[in-house]
Regions:
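Short, solvent-exposed coil/turn linker segments
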Residues: 6, 69-70
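P-loop/Walker A phosphate-binding loop and immediately adjacent motor/lid segment at beta-alpha junctions
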Residues: 50-68, 74
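Canonical P-loop GTPase G-domain recognition
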Residues: 64, 70-128
Length: 128
């Protein structure tokens, strides 16, 4: 189900800083503990704020894409991104993270997604 990413092919100099390499390795080592992926992007620049390695790293995991600062984004471009991300099987939510109510309303949806994974026998819930 999960694939292994060879982070050694990413140089430590140039565009891929060492702290990103280290974080990628740590995430890969912790994948068995991941039930649900929540990826936070800037709604104004979702393509630029997205890490393409995450698609491979978290393949097979339910994923929520949160597009923050939705009030500042172009509605037309937001619709296009929503369609594209949903084709990839991701749940897309636009929000203003300063609004605590919006943020708290996401928790039940995350629980439902994690429980759906549990029913498929692919969850890490109840882990030590």
């Amino acid at each position: 189900m999960a694939t292994t990413i060879d982070f050694s092919r990413y140089p430590l100099t140039g565009w891929y800083p060492g702290h990103m390499l280290k974080a990628g390795r740590q995430m890969q080592a912790s994948l068995k503990l991941v039930d649900l992926v929540v990826e936070l992007l800037d709604a104004r620049i979702p393509g630029s704020s997205r890490n393409p390695i995450f698609d491979q790293l978290f393949r097979g995991r339910p994923t929520f894409i949160l597009l923050n600062k939705a009030d500042l984004a172009s509605p037309r471009v937001s619709r296009e991104w929503t369609a594209s991300l949903r084709k990839e099987g991701k749940k897309v939510v636009f929000l203003d993270a300063r609004d605590t109510r919006q943020t708290l309303e996401l928790v039940p949806a995350w629980r439902r997604a994690a429980l759906a994974e549990r029913s498929k026998g692919r969850t890490a819930l109840n882990r030590p």
